[in-house]
């Protein structure tokens, strides 16, 4: 207070009074008044900050001096007492008890039962340094004792003394291993869940790999048979649709269906005017059974024993394979489908010839027939897990068509 009184008087004489007199005698505008106010506020803040800094630095200096003096006193007291290290070889009986006690204290979070350890009285008790309270240290703290010593020197000295501690001796027994706690509320339930086979990914993969595929039910199989019969009957009654207007001669050559004429087969080709696939004049104009004029009845019966029993046909063939190929004309079945435009063909070589139109060299050619000409087919029910091969469906349709009136029989010679 004695030092602060002269400073306040000095501040009033040197700064407050002259500035107040100058402001009273000077008339300033609003702009100058604003600038002067900001300058006064800035000077005030600077002075207050400087006063606070000096006060804080003085407090810090006193605190550091007190800490240094207290550290020196503690070092002197520890040198005078010279306690025996608990890990030294002079007290080997207390080592197991101390290690067990430390392990129990570190595992307080585990649900372990308390263990009572009885330690016998030692002949040479360990003398610990006296513990000083904070109140006693504050009361006995000197003001300016050894102020020149820095805190770094004391810290270095303490670190050197602690680094030269003797290594702990080897233990004559094996310490018990404490299990790591499971981070869940119910440890027993978690252990049981981890041992379950459903938590093993290898077990789950093996179970799903060996699981058999579900078999179709009787209702699904019956529905599939009804769909096949409906498709076979529908193919007979479907009218042939006209070809679109952009049908050209080049397109007609690409999709020309050439049935081999060997062994008595006929040739059919699309008509440019109507787009229908018709037979040759020799087969379409005949009203009765077709008999070749170049051979007699006996020769034809021996060489071509298989006869087409379709209405107004009566054509003969040498084997059943040629007869089945011929039946495609009457039944309208086309088992080979183009994967690009979904167009159907009765022979595979015609499909391969048609696929060339979709190659990059002939990409300018557009579709010849519409993708879905059969708009009258009703919506079929959805069947799951039923995979029926394409050959089986075509064979079933051909069999149904043959049973309705186009049965091929071996002629009696």
Swiss-Prot record:
Alphabetical list of SMART domains matching this protein: ZnF_C2H2
Keywords: DNA-binding, Metal-binding, Nucleus, Repeat, Zinc, Zinc-finger
GO MF, any single term: zinc ion binding
PROSITE patterns xrefs: ZINC_FINGER_C2H2_1, ZINC_FINGER_C2H2_2
Tagged with keyword Protein biosynthesis: no
Superkingdom to which the source organism belongs: Eukaryota
Compositional bias per record (Polar residues), positions renumbered to this chain: 270-281
Gene3D superfamilies tied to this protein: Classic Zinc Finger
Entry's localization field: Nucleus
Cellular-component GO terms for this entry: nucleus
Region Disordered, annotated ranges: 130-151, 259-290
Segments forming C2H2-type zinc fingers: 306-330, 336-358
PANTHER family according to UniProt: KRUEPPEL-LIKE TRANSCRIPTION FACTOR, KRUPPEL-LIKE FACTOR 15
Protein name, as recorded: Putative zinc finger protein B0310.2
Record organism: Caenorhabditis elegans
Lineage: Eukaryota, Metazoa, Ecdysozoa, Nematoda, Chromadorea
